[in-house]
């Protein structure tokens, strides 16, 4: 352990705060274990405008040497909204926003333009797009349910019920009472090239694939808590789920095309932190997880059936949670070419937690490229040999060199003015201008394989074989409105016959077809996550290979990253066994037959490997032989200023689910677990139960509706002005009105990112080891990932949607508006089930603080004093808020002067939630109990 920790000596992380309390720079120190020099500082800078808006970021590499090249620059509106953003990696984006902050038009460096149309309620109606030299095409149209009886019977009122998008038409026939779809259908466009949606629905349908068999309908049934009880996919295959009292999966079953029900998983056991400890798969394999009682890290992951040990992974960590070894004790020690080959992987990191070396096992035929190594069949671990890989990175985090045992080193050339990189070719100068488009998308995968991109910077096509004057071999992709792939088509020419290999991705189902004029193979891949195992059932409608049993079940046993290590059949016999290099390349794979392993589609990190050699991650494609993404991060700076870097060069510990959640194991998470005493139950939505995600979505939706209503009320006139006086003081609150409108608009725009944008997965779910801990949520104001940490109490009760909405407004205001916690209102009023009773209670609590009643001034002084003592507020901030930083003057003013109290309340996070509920709470009347008489509109306090 001494060797592990010595590299971190004299390498602190420093944060430089300007007099306004803004983070001006971050300094980290880089050192490797074999370094003989002093640690090298690397400085990341943030530059702000006079009002405090972030206008530029500088990274350590591009700003080195005194010639500062800004990695990202921004031009902001007067209210702080970003109008123009420019990245050295991703090019520029220009947005035109309306008075509500919604984007109406958008342009980029490729000459693409997008126009957005909204209705009076702020809902999108249509999206038009055009390229630099192409026509305007309406590529999306939205249709909503009205309020008539034919809509209310299906819970369609106000819901998006038909969406003509980039792949076809998505329609929802029924919604449940909780807003989840009960029945939805997908139809695909006949042609891959979008010709634009006409306004008439019949004309739209004419552009879709004809026939009833081309309407793919999925159905669900939910519990009262929103848990999925039954899912019937588009081919009629059904999955059934059962949960325990805590909402955790207890068992799952599968029914294939009206045949007998098959048990997929059962006997699941969880520990006090909600983490799974044991489960039994349908093939009899018992999986067990062992956690370290000191830090809750997983130490052992095993799977066995009877006396057969199928998997036994033992993990060892450094003090901050980096994995330093993985020992598979289910595998034997072997000998190859006079070398002892142990089934152990070892890892070493630099002071920035970047992986710099790894050892493990490989097959001799493995290479550094997009292809797979030769299959070992039958399974024979004795054919594996040792390997050593080492990596070097530049100051910007670009992987510039990979050395591999006795093979030639692999180098990357990085552009001097960006992070765009190309494989080094000896004797050839890299042409970054010709290899990337203006938006930073790679145009050539490998020599001879061109790539084409959509207006939304999604990979549209890869030319696999170019034939002048003849049809190319290619693979093409279609995406839905959310940016997720829903269709893949590969065409290949052989013996003058064009064959098509196509995949349609539907909820829980992949329909894979292959053929020339007609499909001679039709395969349904039925997918479900049954506890630990990712279960896939192969159901052939046509063309089943004779070597594969009918309706073959495949259980995938994964490692800690979710990579598919073993595939087992229904008798727990081995189908395939695979190992991976740290950056995702296949180091070796074994299987019992060539035919069976052909149908292994999911590999590294649980992602699908395309014929191109790229892994599809949901929003981007990853090239494992390059160790980087092939296009910039669509969320821009959510995970640093290098938009091509993969999981911060720590692929052993960090996992990118969709390219959305970031920050695993960083300094904030360490503080959460080791200082604050919480245990992290899950990161992002994918690691939570459906019921938890549903409650979170309800809270976000409620908060967004309240913010929208608050802005509308404040802008409409003076009807709610006295509500402002209730919160901030009589005759004072009205003066805050213009500033409040701007700040609520900023909050509303930020909530869009948490509902459907780049921050959708930036939630961390916690369990407190202290039973009496009443905390619901918190944030770290300087967190570059803008995460919201939620305790289990915040998302465990469907009756507390209102509490959750106010909590989310409170926490996000810290991140967006730099608010403080000067005062907390009592939560007693929130328990009132009557809307008018709630308003009366909130009004009373607001006046307690604004009028200085019930000792509230003393509470404010105590909170303020604690913030100063903990250095959570600077003297400069105090002067900006109150005009003085003298605590005695502040205490005296808050006790006696309403103006002092009003300033404290104006910058108080809880006051933003309180004001929103008092002014815009009418948007949530449906959350309260129904009275026999219609509930009247809330009367303003004139």
Q: Where would I find each of the regions flagged by the language model?
A:
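Thioester-forming pentapeptide GCGEQ
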Residues: 1-44, 49-50, 200-203, 214-217, ...
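Carboxylate/His-rich catalytic cores and anion/metal-binding grooves
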Residues: 25, 39-61, 172-183, 401, ...
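Acidic/glycine-rich beta-solenoid
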Residues: 33, 63-82, 89-90, 125-161, ...
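A motif-centric feature for acidic-aromatic and gly/ser/thr-rich catalytic loops and repeats
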Residues: 199, 545-618
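Short turn/helix-capping motifs enriched in Asx and small/polar residues
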Residues: 387, 572-589, 598, 613-614, ...
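Active-site alpha-helix of zinc metalloproteases
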Residues: 555, 577, 645, 802-807
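Active-site His/Glu-centered metal-binding helix of metallohydrolases
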Residues: 561, 621, 808, 812-817
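Predominantly extracellular/secreted Zn2+-dependent metalloproteases
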Residues: 661-806, 815-942
């Amino acid at each position: 352990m001494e060797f592990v920790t010595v590299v971190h000596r004299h390498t602190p992380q420093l944060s430089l705060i300007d007099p306004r309390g803004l983070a001006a720079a971050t300094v980290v120190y880089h050192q490797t274990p074999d370094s003989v020099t002093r640690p090298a500082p690397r400085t990341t800078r943030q530059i702000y405008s006079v009002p405090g808006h972030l206008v530029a970021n500088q990274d350590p590499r591009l700003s080195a040497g005194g010639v500062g090249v800004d990695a990202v620059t921004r031009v902001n509106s007067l209210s702080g909204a970003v109008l123009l953003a420019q990245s050295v990696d991703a090019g520029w984006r220009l947005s035109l926003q309306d008075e509500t902050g919604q984007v109406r038009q958008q342009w980029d460096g490729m000459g693409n333009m997008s126009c957005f149309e909204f209705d009076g309620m702020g809902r999108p109606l249509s999206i038009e797009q055009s390229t630099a030299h192409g026509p305007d095409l309406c590529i999306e149209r939205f249709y909503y349910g009205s309020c008539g009886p034919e809509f209310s019977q299906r819970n369609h009122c106000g819901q998006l019920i038909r969406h003509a998008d980039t792949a076809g038409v998505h329609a929802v026939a029924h919604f449940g009472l909780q807003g989840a779809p009960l029945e939805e259908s997908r139809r695909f466009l006949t042609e891959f090239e979008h010709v634009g949606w006409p306004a008439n629905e019949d004309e739209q349908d004419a552009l879709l694939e004809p026939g009833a068999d081309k309407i793919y309908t999925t159905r669900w049934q939910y519990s009262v808590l929103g848990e999925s009880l039954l899912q019937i996919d588009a081919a009629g295959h059904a999955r059934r789920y059962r949960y325990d009292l805590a909402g955790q999966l207890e068992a799952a079953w599968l029914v294939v095309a009206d045949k007998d029900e098959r048990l997929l998983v059962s006997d699941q056991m969880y520990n006090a932190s909600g983490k799974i400890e044991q489960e039994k798969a349908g093939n009899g394999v018992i999986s067990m997880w062992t956690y370290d009682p000191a830090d809750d890290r997983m130490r052992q992951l095993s799977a066995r059936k009877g006396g057969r040990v199928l998997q036994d992974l033992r993990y060892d960590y450094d003090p901050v949670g980096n994995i330093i070894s993985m020992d598979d004790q289910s595998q034997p020690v072997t000998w190859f070419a006079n070398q002892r080959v142990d089934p152990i992987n070892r890892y070493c990191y630099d002071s920035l937690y970047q992986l710099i070396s790894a050892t493990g096992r490989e097959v001799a035929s493995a290479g550094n490229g997009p292809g797979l190594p030769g299959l070992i069949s039958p399974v024979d671990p004795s054919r594996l040999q040792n390997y050593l890989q080492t990596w070097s990175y530049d100051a910007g985090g670009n992987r510039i060199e990979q050395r591999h045992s006795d093979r030639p080193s692999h180098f990357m050339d990085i552009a001097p003015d960006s992070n765009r990189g190309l494989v080094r070719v000896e004797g050839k100068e890299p042409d970054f201008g010709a290899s990337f488009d203006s938006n930073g998308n790679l145009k050539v995968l490998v020599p001879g394989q061109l790539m084409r991109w959509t207006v939304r910077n999604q990979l549209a096509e890869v030319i696999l074989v170019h034939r002048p004057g003849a049809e190319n071999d290619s693979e093409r992709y279609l995406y839905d409105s959310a940016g997720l792939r829903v269709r893949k088509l590969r065409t290949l020419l052989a013996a003058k016959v064009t064959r098509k290999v196509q995949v349609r991705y539907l909820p829980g189902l992949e329909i894979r077809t292959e053929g020339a004029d007609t499909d001679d193979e039709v395969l349904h891949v039925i997918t479900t996550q049954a506890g630990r195992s990712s279960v896939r059932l192969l159901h052939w409608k046509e063309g089943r290979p004779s070597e594969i049993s009918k309706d073959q079940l495949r259980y995938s046993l994964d490692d800690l990253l979710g990579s598919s290590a073993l595939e087992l059949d229904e008798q727990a016999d081995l189908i395939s066994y695979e190992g991976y290099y740290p950056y995702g390349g296949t180091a070796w794979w074994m299987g019992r037959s060539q035919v069976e392993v052909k149908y292994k589609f999911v590999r590294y990190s649980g992602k699908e490997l395309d014929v191109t050699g790229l892994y599809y991650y949901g929003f981007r494609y990853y090239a494992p032989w390059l160790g980087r993404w092939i296009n910039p991060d669509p969320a821009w700076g959510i995970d640093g200023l290098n938009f091509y870097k993969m999981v911060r060069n720590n692929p052993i510990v960090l996992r990118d689910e969709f390219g959305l959640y970031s920050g695993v194991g960083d300094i904030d998470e360490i503080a959460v677990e080791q200082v604050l005493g919480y245990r992290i139950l899950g990161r992002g939505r994918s690691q939570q139960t459906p019921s938890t995600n549903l409650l979170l979505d309800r809270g976000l939706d409620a908060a967004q509706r309240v913010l929208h209503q608050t802005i509308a009320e404040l802008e409409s006139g003076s009807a709610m002005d006295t509500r402002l006086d209730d919160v901030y003081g009589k005759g004072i609150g009205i003066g805050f009105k213009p500033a409040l409108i701007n700040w609520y608009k900023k909050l509303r725009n930020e909530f869009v990112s948490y509902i459907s944008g780049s921050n959708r997965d930036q939630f961390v779910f916690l369990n407190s080891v202290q039973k009496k801990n009443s905390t619901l949520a918190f944030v770290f104001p300087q967190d570059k990932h803008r995460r919201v940490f939620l305790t289990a109490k915040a998302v465990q009760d469907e009756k507390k949607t209102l509490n959750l909405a106010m909590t989310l407004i409170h926490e996000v205001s810290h991140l967006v508006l730099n608010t403080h916690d000067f005062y907390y209102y009592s939560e007693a009023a929130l328990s009132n089930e009557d809307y008018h009773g709630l308003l009366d209670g909130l009004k009373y609590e607001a006046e307690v603080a604004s009028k200085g009643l019930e000792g509230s001034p003393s509470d404010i002084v105590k909170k303020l004093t604690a913030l100063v003592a903990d250095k959570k507020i600077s003297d400069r901030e105090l002067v900006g808020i109150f005009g003085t930083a003298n605590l005695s003057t502040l205490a005296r003013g808050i006790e006696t002067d309403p103006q002092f109290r009003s300033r404290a309340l104006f910058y108080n996070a809880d006051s933003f939630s309180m004001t929103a509920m008092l002014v815009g709470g009418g948007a949530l009347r449906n959350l309260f109990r129904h009275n026999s008489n219609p509930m009247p509109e809330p009367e303003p306090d004139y």
